[in-house]
Amino acid sequence: MSGTFGYELDPRRLTADERAEMRAQIAEFRKYYRVIQAGEYDRLTDACAGGLTAWQHTAADKGEALVCVVTPPVRANAPFATVYPRRLDPDAEYEVNGRERRTGAALMYGGLPVPQEAEDWRAAQFHLVRV
């Protein structure tokens, strides 16, 4: 989730379930809008290197970050993937996706383990909020 967000379709042709899914997607985008539009953007990996692709939006005050990851096609016995956020306050504590807490230093140097998926091109997001 980055940049502009919208749909090019006729919503009158959608089912009730599809409209509900769209509402949920729009609500999620609005939740992160400020950090996506006004935050600092970092590429965390090289998208052309063949591995996972990751990028990050960070608020100017380092109080919030959104890390986005897209995994490559699944390989048998692939190594565990880790993504390393940037621009965090190393001394601050951050809540990851509203659950666990880690310091900025632990996140930047220890990284975030990327969930292993059984499908190609799966995406994951990590919402980091300073507490």
Q: What kind of feature is each model-predicted range?
A:
Residues 104-131:
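C-terminal beta-strand-rich structural cap/linker in extracellular carbohydrate-active enzymes
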Residues 1-100, 104:
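Active-site-proximal substrate-binding groove within the catalytic cores of carbohydrate-active enzymes
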